[in-house]
Amino acid sequence: MKKHIPNAITMMNLFSGCVAVAMAFSGNFGAVVVWVLMAAVFDFFDGFAARLLGVSSKMGVELDSLADVVSFGVAPATAVFILLRDFSAYPDFLLPLSTILPYTAFLLPVFSALRLAKFNLDDRQTSSFLGLPTPADALFWISYCYGVQYLSPLNEKICYSTLGFIVIFSLLMVSEIPMFSLKIKKIQFAGNEKQALLVVSMIAFVALWGIIGVAWGILFYIALSIFGNSFGKTKR
């Protein structure tokens, strides 16, 4: 019986992702944030439960990836699609493409699937990541969409930034750039400096700017990973 518990938690992740997709189509980005965050919680606890109970299976690994594609790929991409579909400030030269450009959002789940497949086959990513993790990508987009909808007036810069971020984040997910993990093996500051700095910064960003502060936190996470790696190499 206990071997089915982690898979049941994973299916709650998938269910949350499906509801997030439905909420995105209705334009309720606040609900999208809630359901994707719930999916992230379930995504954490399915692995935690598997380790705690001492159970694992190939089915569990595959099911986890399928759930993540929906919750952290399709769900945030649907929110981005709706944002671009209803966008009213396309620059003049992009107006002829305004009915096509929203579909670029679905590059995100495509590259999420590639990233997850790569992760499953890569034994180098046990204590850290190569490329941007899909949950981090999802957190960026759900907070970005939630925050942007309240900006007035919407302008061409938002159009450019959204399309640019789609390309950048898609490539980051399948890149070979080392990204540190938030998993803390020991409750001590030494060895967890980056994680502590990120958590404190994320809290500060959210306190200053609300939910869209999460997007700034993810950008800080990317910068901290990249420049932290560069500093480490220089130091050595």
Model-flagged regions — what are they?
Residues 1-44, 217, 222, 228:
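Topogenic membrane-insertion module of multi-pass membrane proteins
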Residues 1, 25-31, 91-100, 119-127, ...:
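Short juxtamembrane and helix-loop transition motifs at transmembrane-helix boundaries
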Residues 1-14, 50-69, 114-136, 178-193, ...:
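Interhelical loop and helix-boundary elements at the membrane-water interface
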Residues 126-236:
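C-terminal membrane-associated helical module and adjoining short loops/tails
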Residues 19-34, 76-103, 144-161, 208-212:
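Helix-coil boundary and interhelical linker segments in multi-pass alpha-helical membrane proteins
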Residues 7-10, 52-117:
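Multi-pass membrane catalytic core of lipid/isoprenoid biosynthesis enzymes
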